[in-house]
Amino acid sequence: GEIARAGAKLVMLDDDYRLAYRPNGLACCCERHLKRIGEILGRDVDRPQVKAGVLNGPMNDIRRAWMQANGESLLALAQRCREAVDRVDPRIQLGFCSCLSSWSGIDGTDALALTRAFAGSAAPFLRTIGAPYWHVAHNWGASLGDIIELNRMEAHWSQHSGFERFAEGDVYPRPRFACPAAYLEAFDTALEASGELDGILKYVLDYSASPRYETGYVEQS
């Protein structure tokens, strides 16, 4: 709400609107989530039972309840954010950057449902996940080609959504000796040639340094 009142026409929550795939563990099992899991199951469960059900064996009732509770939480917060923005101006666009768990289903919801919840009656948008900096660190063993194809796959999954969709042109941590501008431009060129997405969000400025420190990404764009 405060950001909307400041005059923003578009608000995007950056990475990590998720519960799964976190550095401190796999999703949440706080008291409220534990209570909700029990409500869904119709019986009380403790954390060791949830852990065993989530992490072992085929799909089961505990894992389904855990995923449902996760999804309900994420969707409810997205709707609360939308309501706060609507109180200022329902035309303000609100959305998020998808994460790996936004597409895997493990969060109990998906990128499309979350985008609609954030968007409300405003025009929906979605940033895909998969960035050039992954190639530098070989995150999950990914090459630049793999990362490009991941974005194309997400574009396919959302092709009938009616959303404005754009790629994650992130070169974290910057500057160019960490992630060359050539990787960003190759990524952008391939996706532009492929044509599935509407554009790209290029993260070309260092988060903490002067904007005059590293100008090469902009110069190469």
Language-model segments: residues:
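Polysaccharide-binding and catalytic clefts of secreted carbohydrate-active enzymes
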Residues: G1-E149
